[in-house]
């Protein structure tokens, strides 16, 4: 962890991290980087190496089925049906998600930026409140105890289309026509493991506050972000680490009709004609997890959204060969 604050007792600005291997670090309030307590000045060597947690090959599994049916009523008219179903299951992984607290953390989430950590927190080694309004600058703690961030996706795609295709004779020429309808849907769900519920971290009366207030709330466990790796227990993680699910879907409905033929001959060739109509309707929706909507999730906040629009299109084409 990294702790940047102004000591309320001495007025000294600190930028510290616990020494390696220290279970319960002791703080003596001394300034500078020559220290007699269990901390040292934060430096480049203390930064986290992401490489070990990233995946070179992203797991992905696809399952699909496709079916097609075609029926000839006669030589001039045929009917077809196409259907498709596909499922993708994939996983992304990133380094353990950091917890950033304080005004310089820059999370954009007031639950993190405006935090107050009580001196009564049993794991607070500094002996005074850490208050974003007065002396707290920034706290950064990467809870390696919670494991890497994992994003599991399940994406289902369905497609169904049917139509008629044919020809007919009229006005001394052959006409080609087709009509079809189609519906497709793409539905996705992403489940995020390894993130943090900032509401429980923020509340001074709960995980980082007075232990008596925390004890009065079912499931609350005082949180230790002040010690080194291993200080956050499974019980603490269960209180602050939710499973976040975001869902989205897109739908497309389509109808189209087309007609074409050759109209007459010129020295350069046949003048041909094509015309048609197409209707499309697009629908989409995104439903983030309630924790995300409530701005209690450590990631970027977002709101549910949905919408749709229709498109009506018609076209007319002529192909006129000018030169032979």
What feature does the model see in each segment?
Residues 310-323:
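Structured alpha-helical segments in the cores of large, soluble enzyme domains
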Residues 2-62, 66, 72-311:
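Surface-exposed, low-complexity loop segments enriched in small/polar and acidic residues
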């Amino acid at each position: 962890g990294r702790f940047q604050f102004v000591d309320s007792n001495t007025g000294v600005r600190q930028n510290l991290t616990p020494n390696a291997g220290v279970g319960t670090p002791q703080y003596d309030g001394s300034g500078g980087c020559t220290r007699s307590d269990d901390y040292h000045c934060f430096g480049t060597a203390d930064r986290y190496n992401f490489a070990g947690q990233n995946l070179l090959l992203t797991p992905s599994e696809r399952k699909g089925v496709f079916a097609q049916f075609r029926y000839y009523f006669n030589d001039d008219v045929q009917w077809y049906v196409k259907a498709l179903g596909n499922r993708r299951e994939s996983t992304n992984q990133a380094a353990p998600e950091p917890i950033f607290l304080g005004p310089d953390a820059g999370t954009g989430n007031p639950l993190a930026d405006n935090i107050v950590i009580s001196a009564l927190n049993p794991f607070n080694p500094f002996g005074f409140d850490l208050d974003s309004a007065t002396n707290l600058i920034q706290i950064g703690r990467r809870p390696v105890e919670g494991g890497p961030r994992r994003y599991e996706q399940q994406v289902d795609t369905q497609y169904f289309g049917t139509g008629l295709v044919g020809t007919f004779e009229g006005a001394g020429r052959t006409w080609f026509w087709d009509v079809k309808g189609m519906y497709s849907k793409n539905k996705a769900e992403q489940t995020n493991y390894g993130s943090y519920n900032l509401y429980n971290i923020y509340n001074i009366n709960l995980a980082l506050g007075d232990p008596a207030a925390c004890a009065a709330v079912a499931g609350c466990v005082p949180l230790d972000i002040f010690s080194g790796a291993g200080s956050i227990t499974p019980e603490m993680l269960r209180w602050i680490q939710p499973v976040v699910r975001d869902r989205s879907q897109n739908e497309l409905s389509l109808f189209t009709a087309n007609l074409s033929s050759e109209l007459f001959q010129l020295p350069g060739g046949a003048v041909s004609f094509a015309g048609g109509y197409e209707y499309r309707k697009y629908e989409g929706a995104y439903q983030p997890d309630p924790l995300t909507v409530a701005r209690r999730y450590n990631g970027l906040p977002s709101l549910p959204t949905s919408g749709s629009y229709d498109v009506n299109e018609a076209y007319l084409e002529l192909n006129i060969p000018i030169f032979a």
